[in-house]
């Protein structure tokens, strides 16, 4: 009888689902950077006259500041090349950028701005010292308040790409440029989000090294 009981226990253990890697999604190598419950590894940048930062309804709320509010990632060190970061963002108040991502290009910082300069400009700041409003990435994406948008940035040796929903809005060769950020968002390095006189919500923040991505995704 004892042999039977032990056999049943071993069989049950064998058919249990394997544990998921800590902090990682079950699919495609993505790792969650926000649990939807607390700021966790995200901290307020404490800009002068910045707005309130808190967690509400599963999102990080980056309140409207005078002029800016921001958060910065203070968790375990992440790769600075051959990676992608994705998030969802919504502007609930204001008409300027609401979830601008500062991210590293190897050792240099850069910012992906969506709906900056009064809502009219989307692009990377800065390339060869030029802002998103005056460089090769300058474009316009119409943003509506109270609507969620999916955003993503990917960096490799040969490309920097960025998407808003399914539209690729940035594609450049990083070897052709030097990268920097405006001094106002320096506190968002290496990874951080900022808003300008606007309130933004950010959720579903995910990161993956392209080394962990399935082959079908590495060229997307």
What is the predicted function of each stretch?
Residues 6-17:
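Hydrophobic h-region of N-terminal signal peptides that target proteins for export
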Residues 15-220:
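Carbohydrate-interacting regions of secretory-pathway proteins
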Residues 1-4:
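Positively charged n-region of N-terminal signal peptides that target proteins for export
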């Amino acid at each position: 009888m004892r042999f039977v009981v032990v056999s049943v226990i071993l069989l049950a253990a064998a058919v249990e689902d394997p544990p998921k890697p800590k902090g990682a999604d079950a699919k495609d190598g993505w790792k969650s950077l926000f649990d939807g419950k607390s700021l966790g590894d995200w901290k307020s940048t404490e800009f002068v006259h910045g707005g309130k930062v808190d967690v509400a309804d599963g999102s990080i709320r980056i309140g409207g500041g005078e002029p800016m509010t921001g958060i910065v990632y203070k968790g375990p060190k992440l790769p600075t090349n051959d990676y992608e970061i994705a998030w969802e963002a919504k502007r609930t108040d204001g008409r300027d950028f609401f979830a601008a991502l500062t991210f590293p290009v190897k050792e240099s910082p850069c910012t992906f701005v969506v709906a900056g300069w009064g809502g009219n400009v989307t692009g990377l700041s800065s390339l060869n010292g030029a802002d998103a409003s005056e460089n090769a990435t300058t474009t316009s994406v119409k943003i509506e308040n109270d609507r969620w948008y999916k955003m993503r940035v990917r960096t490799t040796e040969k490309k920097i790409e960025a998407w808003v929903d399914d539209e690729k809005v940035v594609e450049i060769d990083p070897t052709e440029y030097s990268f920097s950020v405006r001094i106002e968002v320096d506190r968002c390095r290496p990874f951080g989000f900022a808003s300008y006189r606007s309130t933004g919500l950010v959720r579903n923040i995910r990161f993956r090294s392209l080394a962990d991505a399935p082959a079908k995704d590495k060229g997307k």
